[in-house]
Amino acid sequence: MDSADPQLNRFLQQLQAETQRQKFTEQVHTLTGRCWDVCFADYRPPSKMDGKTQTCIQNCVNRMIDASNFMVEHLSKMNGGHV
């Protein structure tokens, strides 16, 4: 099979895009689960989300994203800029 085959290249691009979507979805589920545990410690969400809970979830997600970005940058520096 020739690596310059346009169909193969399209397939590989689609496969890469799907893999990225799956990783993103997995990240969202992970963040949701962790922040749920932090912000709803009794495992019972209120019937209506109040300002305190909404702020908790926003702060939790933001901290998780910050931590993830920090780790990516740190690992990138350790690899000499190659992630």
From Swiss-Prot:
Disruption phenotype: Worms display mitochondria with an interconnected morphology, presumably due to defects in the assembly of outer membrane fission/fusion components.
Membrane topology category: Peripheral membrane protein
Entry annotated with the keyword Metal-binding: yes
Principal cellular location given in the protein's record: mitochondrion
Cystines in this chain: C35-C60, C39-C56
UniProt keywords, alphabetically: Chaperone, Disulfide bond, Membrane, Metal-binding, Mitochondrion, Mitochondrion inner membrane, Protein transport, Translocation, Transport, Zinc
GO cellular component, one term: mitochondrial inner membrane
Protein name: Mitochondrial import inner membrane translocase subunit Tim8
Source organism of the structure: Caenorhabditis elegans
